Regions:
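Phosphate/NTP-binding elements of NTP-utilizing enzymes
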Residues: 1-180
Length: 180
């Protein structure tokens, strides 16, 4: 499964194999299952440099994007870490994306993080070692150099952040033109 998840740049295999999400119908967390249009969105992310999702509210795209970012961070190397910038019209909304991503990162099986973070010995310190170098409301930084940053929209939203590899503009309809 790992090799298939790694090879699948849409991250569908990774998401459906290793992640779970809240199912409102069942009222509990269940294994992530992508609907056909969600699969099409993930395939578009894999095949295109820039993707804009124009969709109604409550379609699960923010959660799906968070799951995809998780896959990108899991498979990133220290030589080419991901820098993800999440911008929303309010800081709290951008921080909600970080909460989703953190939840997904914590679901990733420990062995996927490598020998420094996993041991078959259940009493090993490796199994509880944090994958986060920074774990704050506004930013996550993983041991492999990946960063996820939350910012409110505004003229300085991306100031001080270089080499953004993934930009998420959440609820873009509420972001004023020219301030993201």
């Amino acid at each position: 499964d790992y090799a298939l998840a790694y090879a699948d740049k849409s991250r569908i295999k990774f998401i459906e194999t290793y992640l779970s999400t809240f199912n409102a119908t069942k009222g509990k967390k269940t294994q992530f299952h992508c609907f056909p249009r969600q699969r099409a969105f993930l395939k578009a992310l894999a095949e295109n440099r820039n993707v804009v999702a124009i969709k109604p509210r409550q379609c699960g795209i923010t959660t799906l994007s968070s799951a995809w970012v998780t896959g990108q961070c899991v498979f990133a190397s220290k030589d080419a870490p991901e820098t993800v910038l999440c911008i929303a019209n309010k800081l709290e909304q951008a921080q909600e994306i970080i909460i989703k991503i953190r939840d997904f990162l914590e679901q990733v099986p420990r062995w996927m993080w490598g020998n420094d973070y996993f041991s078959p010995d259940p009493n090993s310190e490796k199994n509880i070692k944090s994958i986060f170098e920074k774990d704050a409301k506004g930013e996550l930084k993983l041991f492999n150099g990946c960063r996820v940053i939350a910012r409110a929209s505004g003229p300085n939203a991306s100031r001080g952040i270089s080499a953004v590899s993934v930009l998420i503009l959440d609820e873009a309809a509420f972001i004023e033109e020219g301030v993201a």
